[in-house]
């Protein structure tokens, strides 16, 4: 049974096995004393989390080994990095790059976001703000300096007949006296119950990245959509 079909079953079972207060009484004491049933829900929810993690890992692994955009090719530098080892529910990453210090990190969250939408929402905005705060933290730690966060922008993309909406924000900073730029792109895939973050990091002045980022983003989101569709079909 695939994740999409199995999740509701496990969740309903988990709810059915939530601890229920039970009252007992005696002749000496008419007061009710609550007694909790054994907890089974934690194990079931852990099972759901495990299934989601396996699906997210398979999804990030399904991304193409290379991504082309115009005349540029970005090859896989790190196929799958398991962030679950560091923090439960953290998710998985795949890293692309070229020979000129361009790094593209795809991050697929493992966060069980039920009821999420493919469109940009207040939740998307809040998640973007959280990641932008990380740049301030990097500056406070001395790893970055001269951090400048640009305006957030909602962008509509289309690829292979599919529509995608993302929230994007440019960030410029200096790292070891080198001027760099990051472009954060945040989208969502409701079928995978997950947000997708793509971070482009490159030396300032690389106009080719400005031209290619939308194509790369659309290709990645489309590949994840194809994976999700195949999972539903099986």
Walk through the language-model features, giving the residues of each.
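N-terminal "mature-domain start" segment
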Residues: 19-103
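Surface-exposed amphipathic alpha-helical segments
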Residues: 193-234
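Glycine-rich, often proline-containing surface loops adjacent to acidic residues and nearby aromatics
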Residues: 101-105, 163-165, 191-199
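C-terminal motif of bacterial Sec signal peptides marking the signal peptidase cleavage site
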Residues: 13-14
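Extended hydrophobic
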Residues: 178-201
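Sec-dependent signal peptide recognition
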Residues: 2-9
